[in-house]
Each structure stands twice: as C-alpha cells, then as structure tokens.
Amino acid sequence: MPLSYQHFRKLLLLDEEAGPLEEELPRLADEGLNRRVAEDLNLGNLNVSIPWTHKVGNFTGLYSSTVPCFNPNWQTPSFPDIHLQEDIVDRCQQFVGPLTVNENRRLKLIMPARFYPNVTKYLPLDKGIKPYYPEHVVNHYFQTRHYLHTLWKAGILYKRESTRSASFCGSPYSWEQDLQHGRLVFQTSKRHGDKSCCPQSPGILSRSSVGPCIQSQLRQSRLGPQPAQGQLAGRQQGGSGSIRARVHPSPWGTVGVEPSGSGPTHNCASSSSSCLHQSAVRKAAYSLVSTSKGYSSSGHAVELHHFPPNSSRSQSQGPVLSCWWLQFRNSEPCSEYCLCHIVNLIEDWGPCTEHGEHLIRTPRTPARVTGGVFLVDKNPHNTTESRLVVDFSQFSRANTRVSWPKFAVPNLQSLTNLLSSNLSWLSLDVSAAFYHLPLHPAAMPHLLVGSSGLSRYVARLSSNSRIINNQHRTMQNLHNSCSRNLYVSLMLLYKTYGRKLHLYSHPIILGFRKIPMGVGLSPFLLAQFTSAICSVVRRAFPHCLAFSYMDDVVLGAKSVQHLESLYAAVTHFLLSLGIHLNPHKTKRWGYSLNFMGYVIGSWGTLPQEHIVQKIKMCFRKLPVNRPIDWKVCQRIVGLLGFAAPFTQCGYPALMPLYACIQAKQAFTFSPTYKAFLRNQYLNLYPVARQRPGLCQVFADATPTGWGLAIGHQRMRGTFVSPLPIHTAELLAACFARSRSGAKLIGTDNSVVLSRKYTSFPWLLGCAANWILRGTSFVYVPSALNPADDPSRGRLGLYRPLLRLLYRPTTGRTSLYADSPSVPSHLPDRVHFASPLHVAWRPP
C-alpha cells in the first residue's frame, strides 16, 4: 500500500506526537528505509516509457523561447544627460575624508572600465538588427534605429566615422582626449605659400574648435561634387591648388578615407553611394577637410584628393544623387505603392548623416557589428516603453569565452542579519544604472552594434528582391524594394518620425561608450560601483544604514524624519557625483523593506507576496503521476528553491527533484510527494536574524555514540549500529537542540556547521532541517569540546566550559566601514534590535 501523506509526515517527525527523538531520529538515517520510502513515493523510478510533459503552468523547458510581443506604439525612454564625474574619488573624499583601500580600488575599476576579450568575431551589418518580429519588420527596424539614435545623442554610444575615428555627443572624459598624441593640423595651401588653418591642440577635435573654415564646408550639401577619377588623377601633380594634410605619424592610418567596408558587406542598395558610405563610416577626421575655397568637401572616399575648380562639377550643377532614399525623387513611380510617393512628400529630407559634437581616434574598427539588437517591453509591468536588448553572447561562448569576474552576493542569512531591524526604510531608483559607467574607447571595436540601412534590410527580408550588385544598378532595380507593406509601414512611420526616416534609412555602426547590458562584465562593475558608493555613504552617516545590490539602493534610519533628512543629503551627494536618480520611483517602505525579492522586517525575512502567489499557482498546475521533462523541473526547482529556506524541511525536501535533473531524466510527482511539498510551501516561516551570544551547549559524536554538554550537565548515548561520522554529528546536534532548546550550539563538525543537510540520507536531512531551524553553530576544536568525553562514554571527566562568543556574520557584503555604535534614542528598557549596535568588522 502506498505511503499516505499523514503517515509520511509522522515518519519525518513533523508531528508533535512523535516518540523520543533519540530512538526515532537514527532510524531515518537507515539506507533501507530511505530506499523503501523512495520506491513508495515513486521517486527512484527515473526511466519512464510514457511521453514527457513539457509544460507546467507558465513553466516550459529552459531553452524554449517565449515569443515576445511587439508593440507598434512603444515609446523610446529618454536618457537624461548621464555623465558620471571623472573626479568621483576626490568628491567622495571631500564628502567623507580619505577613502578606504576597497572603496578606492572599486572606484578605479570603473574610471574607465576596460574590456579586452581574447577573440572578437565580427558579423556582417545585416545581423545588426535581429529580425525578431517577422510581422513587423520595418516598424521594428525604425524603432530600433530610433532607440540607438537616442542612445548616441545621450552620449552612451560612439558613432564609427571611419576605420580609426568615432564621434560622440555629451561631455568628453580625459582619456578620450589622451588618444590624440600628435597635433592634428589642417592645411590649405594658397598660391602664396602655406597657411595652416586650425592647428589643433592635442585632444578632442571638437565641433566648435574646428573653426569656420571647415564648419562652413561641413554645412554644405553632404552629397557634394563627385570627382571624375580620371581627371582627378590627371590634376594630381598640379601645384597650383594642391593641398597638404599633415598629420603626425599616428593611428589615423592613411590620411583621408576608405569607402567604408569595401568588402561584400557594403554592396548596399545604392550606387557608389558616397552618402551611404558616409553614414556608415564618416570620413576620417571629418574627412580631414582640406579643400580649396568654395568647394564642398565631397566626403566621397578618395585618398584625401582635393578637387581643383575645373576638375569637379561645381555645386550649381546639382549634386549627384547616390542616396538610396533620395534616388526615388527623380524616378518614375512603379505603382501606386511606389516609395517615390513618400519621398516626394517633402522637399527637404535633411542630411544623410549626423555627426557628434566631438571626434576621437579609436583603434581600428571594421565596418561590422559584434552583436545584434532588438526591442522588448521595458518590464512585465511597463509595456508602453521599450528596452533595447543587446546580444553580445559571443563573449560567453565556445572555448574563447571570457571568464567574467565573480563577486559576492549576500546570502539570505547575511542579508537578514544586516537588514532585519526596526529601522524605517526607503529605496532609491538609479535610472539607467549601467549607462553611468564609462568604457575605455579601446573597448569600442569589441562592442559594435548597428544596421546595414533600410534598403538592404528590406531586400534581405523580402523574397522577391535580390541584393543588387552596386555596379549594375538600374532604376528598375531601385524599385525592387517597393511593396504595399513597405509603403503602408513607411506612411505610418512618417507620422512618427517625419524626415528622420531618411536619416534612419542609412547604414550606421555604433560602439558602446558606456557599459552595455548583455556583457558579463557589466553586472560585476555595477555591483562594485554601487557597493563602494554605499560604503562611502555609510561612513558619512554612521548612525544610518545604506546598502545596495546592483542598482537597488536602500537607506535605513531610526525615524521617518531622520530618514527624510538622510534621503535629502544622500540624493544631493549622488547628484553631485553625476548619478541620476528617478525621484518618481523612490519607494518608502515603512518598517518592512522589500528588497531582492524578500520582505525584511524586525521579525525576520519572508519571500515577497508575488513569489508566494507564483508558488501556489505552480502547485495548482502540477500534474500527478505524469513524467515531467527535467528542463521544466529546473524551472520548478528554481522557484521552489528561492522559498526553500522558509519551509520546515528546506532544501533537502527538493533533493529527489535535484537528482532527476542531474540524471537528465523525467520526474513523476506521486500524490503523497506533491501533497508533502504543497504543505511545506503553504506554511512559510520567517528566517530570523542571528543574535550574538555566549555558547553554553556543546555536541559531539563518534560513529558509535553521542555526547552533550549542557551547562554543567553531561549526557551520553549510543547508536544501535555504527553510523558515518557526519551523520552521527548531525544527530548529536539535533539531540542537543531538542534537549536544551538552545539556539546556539558548539560543534566540531564542518558539515553540521555549514547547515547544508542535502548530502545526508534524504529523510534525515528533511527532519534535521526542521529540528535545527533557527539554530546557530559555533566551531569548537575537538580538543577543547566539553562534549568530547561523554561521546566516548567517559562521563566522569569534566573539561571546563569554554567562553565561546558567537558573532553573527553579514558575509562578504562589503561593509568595510567600521561604524561606531549609536546611543539609542528610545527609552533604555526597549531593546533596540539593530545591526547598528554591532560594530562592523571587515570579513
């Protein structure tokens, strides 16, 4: 007869009316009993012939993709002018005095952050925007381009202008100026000798400093005159209008420009498309503009050749239209859905490209991308705004993968010890936290995103048109991309983006200037940054608590008024460092703080309500007697594992599930096992904070017997049959807890000390977890353990009791600030349980 749930509870000693523990508990360590129970609950039967179930409620296999939903009305979030102050260390020192070694080290890591992967794989521009929404290809293309443009305007991206230069917006950092070692000198030569125009001091070539001579030429039509190659070569020796551009030997490569991406990437849908190339890769140093009076710099890539008057068409003859978008203007409409109807809507479509406020030199950057991008909802609760997902997973794959640095995350007990107190709490929201941290420009060539332009994107995705070779282009080929779908999409998008449609239809390559999400280095750097800032805040306000996990920053103070003044001071400090906070998202929690998925109050920690609801839902949908795919089990264990510390039996209860995942076998829930788990998770107990104290109770064991020292009392007992030493030590600890009720026990066994009972026989692990819940252990060396003699059967010998002080740990949660204890503002008779009374020591 299968084991009933009631019987199983009794077996695990979870009911009150269990027999004496010294008899019942050792039985649970018996292998035979564990095996019989596993068979009864159908836990051991891993090989099943029935087909597996691949979906339980919302849980599907780990690698099945949930199809994201496209929203044509997504808003692109705005990014305020985020600029982390470069002298952040000095500012912190003014605020709090000299920084500790740890704070210094962490802040240096991100000023600037560096990223040097072993191998970088470059992908063609077509892979720049992922075709994630096949139904909304054009819409997604423009929304993504607009998002990237917004990021570039906000100073978060560099725009690749040529192989060795990039432009950006926003305030420059010193390391962005250091790149130009030599002086960049523009020279235009006149007949009466050279006159150097705009000598540049080392540093950034800024828009304003380029001087009117160049700026005026930049303002002229981007589609400037196209020289005839033959004439140009013929005039090359002529001295009269010759121009020299002198650049000190430096990483600019050849002066002037190559047409971007001469390789197959760029057979874009345009003729020798000066302006198309120009947008993907701006000519070096604003094409090192050096032209004789009155001629626009064509920007068309020829090795810094200049065009004397008679060799090139003059401006009045009209520019040569080599821009895919503008070519439609002069063409005959091919149908009522021809794109020329849209292009003829307005006269001035604006420039083909935009350029940043500053130009810097970069290491060699190919006209390629290293990761694809696409848009998704900002979060499950906010579907009106979009979020850019960047896929740089190439750096985490294969044998060239980068091993990202590890960093400490506080475990549940450390977090509770630290934050469980009767403080008032408030949490701050750092807006676009990742985009605060600057990257060194040398990392730019490894983190490239972009797109190959609308013409090519549409050509690649529409079945009837082929990607046309630039050389043999006819007007008919131009119309290959016209279709009703494209026409309707563009008409709708015209209402949103207006003349920006033209700008966005050009190719572009952008590199990250701030750390992107989607690279394993970013979470590490963000954690280092926020923990250093919180450490500074804690030292500045020693009677308060500031703590962070990634971009989640919480502040605690003893009263609400105190908290508000702390909030004002900290906000002012963070803003002075250039950290942008989102005041609308500041949450005041009162005395129970919501943080990292937990609710933390003076009573301890529990999971947040939405997680509890998810668990209830999971059990409602969980099928019985049907094999469930192990990948789905991974999902279930992920959810249940989060709340396991709050249940009676903890992680050991999930061991059968872990075993099936390891064996990559399906798991079948028997009615009893499901009922057992369900009841475990319906009643959650808070995890309380550990208190410091003096250890009075000691336990020890040998394979054959156990001994306890409770105050001055000694006890001993023997096991029916010899047990493995770890099992014996665990039993002794359980006896000590049940006999004395003490929450602090001394033991010399490291496994018991670790409080991980998953490696013990299954039934014993479950029972011991419940008996020892909320117990703290202190390590006592065997030689000094007062329970050592009783465990060996010697009751007559008394070793003196040790004065063993127990200090709860806050783990490696970077509380490097030693905080002085604060006199309580409450009356003395009220015990103020706060981590603030305990001076923090570095771990």
Curated annotation (Swiss-Prot):
Region (Disordered): 220-265
Positions of the UniProt region annotated as Spacer: 178-346
Molecular function terms, GO-annotated: DNA binding; DNA-directed DNA polymerase activity; metal ion binding; RNA-directed DNA polymerase activity; RNA-DNA hybrid ribonuclease activity
InterPro entries, sorted: DNA/RNA_pol_sf, DNApol_viral_C, DNApol_viral_N, HBV_DPOL, Rev_trsase/Diguanyl_cyclase, RT_dom, Viral_Replic_Matur_Polypro
Domain annotation Reverse transcriptase: ranges: 357-600
PROSITE patterns hit by this protein: RT_POL
Positions contributing to Mg(2+) binding: 429, 551-552
Site description Priming of reverse-transcription by covalently linking the first nucleotide of the (-)DNA, residues in chain: 63
Claim: Secreted is one of the keywords in the record: no
Activity regulation details: Activated by host HSP70 and HSP40 in vitro to be able to bind the epsilon loop of the pgRNA. Because deletion of the RNase H region renders the protein partly chaperone-independent, the chaperones may be needed indirectly to relieve occlusion of the RNA-binding site by this domain. Inhibited by several reverse-transcriptase inhibitors: Lamivudine, Adefovir and Entecavir.
Disulfide cross-links: none
Additional record remark: Hepadnaviral virions contain probably just one P protein molecule per particle.
Protein name: Protein P
Lineage: Viruses, Riboviria, Pararnavirae, Artverviricota, Revtraviricetes
Gene of this entry: P
